[in-house]
């Protein structure tokens, strides 16, 4: 009779692995929990080479953690997904997912099958999304620009720039509106990547500025070049303009010394011909990711053109998109000849080198294909500037989402409290096992208002109880349905009408975080077996070099 199948590794199954996964998820959530809300605290992360990052952003914290546990990795990837999809709500999505898992584990311990819990969670998530879209949405058209500013301020309130929320909120809204364009379907689009953010340490936060145009952190290649060009025709090149040298390994046998001079002359002429082809199309601004040597700069100075070298590839792509230029990595065409055509040029009203703050920058203004904007951030040190950039990115994404979806929901725990009451009542109408799972889903959502209150040093039990009472009244009594806008005022420690207070979040942030958190919790909940293989050991006859020396294997 054959023995049991042996697996070359560790295997844990059933309740043990489920408890491990829940603990791993809870420990990840506990790391970011204290950073949630307008009075959340920051984290300092030091990597293996000593680089320091100080941040409040959930996605950044989890990205910099080196997590080994596979279930914990799921939550780290979840925060990253929320950051890419929506741009905000990364901390809350992880906290909700961990709480859903914890409560699901309690149910499983009470002998309720994970499949029943999973179907209950899916049903609860679907109902929650439907309830938000039918009852909690505020249309932005009735609120106008103030709504955008308030949504940006809500996003910034927990960040380092929250203290200057009014100043930065206006800057962010202006920047997003400046890069608006209409796509082929006639839909307005707001590409956040078109807003270039530059950082310069020194001065205070409020000396940051918004510039109309794309700001390049470069200067012209030579002092003899013009510093301002009107009606610019821009060539975007992804190669160096330097004297052509023959590749290593190429051997040329010469009998006549004059031939050597001819070869050197031809090397110079190849680059000169390329530059002449570019200038012949009317190009007067040349941007390249590579270098430009002195010989080539001379031709540009004589032609009165502006040449900029060592432009970042990222910046070059954005400028090409904004101006309508083509990025060329070579001038060679399909026939093997080198050509450059006028259609490859981008256009802008003006390209100018200006001194802004303490540095010289090149500004590309009023580009032809799309408009662009740049924000120059000032701060006390590099850590502060980096965190300001992350905060602004979140705020830009929030404003973009509000403009595209044209709807917001009240913040400050209002949505979670309303959903919790609704789902509890909904659970009692279910006559199946899913009832318990839906009730636990409802209880899990209260982790957000609870955490907000705890981080603000308030009595969370008292505050959340009051909040639930208001929302219960709003849902039971149709005459008092305006109470559904009630959320937490964390500074004064009492419930308030967050619609009047202007605490708004994009609807998509709430909807996506609910969906993502539910899916992540379900993914981890389905796991009931973990097999961890042992690392493979190489069958080396002599082992290391030292062992080989001692064994005499190297003597032959």
From Swiss-Prot:
Mg(2+) binds at residue 88. Its main location: cytoplasm. One of its GO terms (molecular function) is ubiquitin protein ligase binding. It catalyses: ATP + H2O = ADP + phosphate + H(+). GO terms for biological process: binding of sperm to zona pellucida; chaperone mediated protein folding independent of cofactor; positive regulation of establishment of protein localization to telomere; positive regulation of telomerase RNA localization to Cajal body; positive regulation of telomere maintenance via telomerase; protein stabilization; scaRNA localization to Cajal body. The modification N6-acetyllysine is found at residues 199, 400, 494. Its EC number is 3.6.1.-. The keyword Nucleotidyltransferase does not apply. The modification Phosphoserine is found at residues 6, 544, 551. ATP binds at residues 37, 89-91. InterPro entries: Chap_CCT_alpha, Chaperone_TCP-1, Chaperonin_TCP-1_CS, Cpn60/GroEL/TCP-1, GroEL-like_apical_dom_sf, GROEL-like_equatorial_sf, TCP-1-like_intermed_sf, TCP-1_chaperonin. It is found in: Cytoplasm, Cytosol; Cytoplasm, Cytoskeleton, Microtubule organizing center, Centrosome. Belongs to the TCP-1 chaperonin family. This is T-complex protein 1 subunit alpha. It comes from Cricetulus griseus (Chinese hamster). The gene is TCP1.
């Amino acid at each position: 009779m054959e023995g049991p199948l042996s697996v070359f590794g560790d295997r844990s199954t059933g309740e043990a692995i489920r408890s491990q996964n829940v603990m791993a998820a809870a420990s990840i959530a506990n790391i970011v929990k204290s950073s949630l809300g307008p009075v959340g605290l920051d984290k300092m992360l030091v990597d293996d080479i000593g680089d320091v990052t100080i941040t409040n952003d959930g996605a950044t914290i989890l990205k910099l953690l080196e997590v080994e546990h596979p279930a914990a990795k799921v939550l780290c990837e979840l925060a990253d997904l929320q950051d890419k999809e929506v741009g905000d709500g990364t901390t809350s999505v992880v906290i909700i997912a961990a709480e859903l898992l914890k409560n699901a584990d309690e149910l499983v311990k009470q002998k309720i099958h994970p499949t029943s819990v999973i179907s209950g969670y899916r049903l609860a998530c679907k109902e929650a999304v439907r309830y938000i879209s039918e009852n909690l949405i505020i249309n932005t058209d009735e609120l106008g620009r103030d709504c955008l500013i308030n949504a940006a301020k809500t996003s910034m309130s927990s960040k380092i720039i929250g203290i200057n929320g009014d100043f930065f909120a206006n800057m962010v809204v202006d920047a997003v509106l400046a890069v608006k364009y209409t796509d082929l379907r006639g839909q307005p689009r707001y590409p956040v990547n078109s807003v270039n953010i530059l950082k310069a340490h020194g001065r205070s936060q409020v000396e940051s500025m918004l510039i109309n145009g794309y700001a390049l952190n470069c200067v012209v290649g030579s002092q003899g070049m013009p510093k301002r060009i009107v009606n610019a025709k821009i060539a975007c090149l992804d190669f160096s303009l330097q004297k052509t040298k023959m590749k290593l390994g190429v051997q040329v046998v010469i009998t006549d010394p004059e031939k050597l001079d001819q070869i050197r002359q031809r090397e110079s002429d190849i680059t000169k011909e390329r530059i002449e082809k570019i200038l012949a199309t009317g190009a007067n601004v040349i941007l390249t990711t590579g270098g430009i040597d002195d010989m080539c700069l001379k031709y540009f100075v004589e032609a009165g053109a502006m040449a900029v070298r060592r432009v970042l590839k990222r910046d070059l792509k954005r400028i090409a998109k904004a101006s309508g230029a083509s990025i060329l990595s070579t001038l060679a065409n399909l026939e093997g000849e080198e050509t450059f055509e006028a259609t490859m040029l981008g256009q802008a009203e003006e390209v100018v080198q200006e001194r802004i703050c303490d540095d010289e920058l090149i500004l590309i203004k009023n580009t032809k294909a799309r408009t662009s904007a740049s924000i120059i951030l000032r701060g006390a040190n590099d850590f502060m500037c980096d965190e300001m950039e992350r905060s602004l990115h979140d705020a830009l994404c929030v404003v973009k989402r509000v403009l595209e979806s044209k709807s917001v929901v009240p913040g400050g725990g209002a949505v979670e409290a309303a959903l919790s009451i609704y789902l509890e009542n909904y659970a009692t109408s279910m006559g199946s096992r899913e009832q318990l799972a839906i009730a636990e889903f409802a209880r899990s959502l209260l982790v957000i208002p609870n955490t907000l209150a705890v981080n603000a040093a308030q009595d969370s039990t008292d505050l959340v109880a009051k909040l639930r009472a208001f929302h219960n009244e709003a849902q039971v009594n149709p005459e008092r349905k305006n109470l559904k806008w009630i959320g937490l005022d964390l500074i004064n420690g009492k419930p308030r009408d967050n619609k009047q207070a202007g605490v708004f979040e994009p609807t998509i942030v709430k909807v996506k975080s609910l969906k993502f958190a539910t899916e992540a919790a379900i993914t981890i909940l389905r796991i009931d077996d973990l097999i961890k293989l042992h690392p493979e050991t190489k069958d080396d006859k002599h082992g290391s070099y030292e062992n080989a020396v001692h064994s005499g294997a190297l003597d032959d």
